[in-house]
């Protein structure tokens, strides 16, 4: 109900329960990765019907099959049925080759995602990482927000700067990083 609306206190929509979803899954029993068809089937079976508030697709260090994962997301995210949860993409660290490839994907699918999760935010280039990504999102006409992950004391020291950008609504603290 409207009287229970906590968005003014929480800074808007709260990401709530975020389910980590590897686009291409590894099967440790036989040491292989899913095929594209298996990954599509799993996505349609489980991701379409998630009860989580945010479905987080990882392209960063938890993702070994990056090119195939990007291809899967490019093909499948536009097919998602109407949903009542957010879709987030965890991208690779700022100014890396993989980050640039992630941006190429985002340019094509930004209308189908809600949040970019920036791993290791601010560790190398400070708040310029958020500033540049924010500017880039504006340049492509995107309404996607940024959720920085603070994983290092250096980033914690500049958390106020990371959060000062209008595209940042929430930050994540890496619980194993401190």
Functional labels for PLM-detected ranges:
Residues 1:
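Short, Gly/Pro- and small/polar-rich lid/capping loops
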Residues 4, 9-178:
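Conserved alpha/beta-domain cores
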């Amino acid at each position: 109900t409207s009287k229970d609306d906590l968005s003014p206190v929480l800074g808007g929509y709260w990401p709530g329960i975020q389910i980590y979803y590897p686009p291409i899954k590894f099967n440790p029993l036989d040491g292989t990765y899913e095929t594209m068809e298996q990954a599509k089937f799993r996505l349609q079976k489980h991701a379409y019907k998630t009860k989580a508030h945010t479905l987080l697709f990882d392209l960063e260090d938890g993702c070994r099959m990056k090119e195939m994962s990007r291809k899967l997301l490019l093909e499948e995210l536009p097919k998602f049925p109407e949903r009542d949860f957010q879709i987030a993409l965890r991208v690779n660290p700022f100014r890396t080759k993989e980050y640039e490839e992630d941006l190429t994907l985002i340019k094509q699918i930004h209308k189908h995602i809600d949040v970019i999760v920036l791993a290791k935010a601010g560790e190398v280039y400070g708040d310029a990482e958020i500033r540049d990504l924010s500017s880039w999102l504006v340049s492509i006409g995107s309404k996607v927000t940024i959720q920085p992950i603070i994983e290092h004391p250096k980033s914690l020291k500049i958390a106020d700067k990371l959060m000062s950008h209008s595209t940042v609504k929430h930050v994540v603290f890496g619980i194993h990083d401190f």
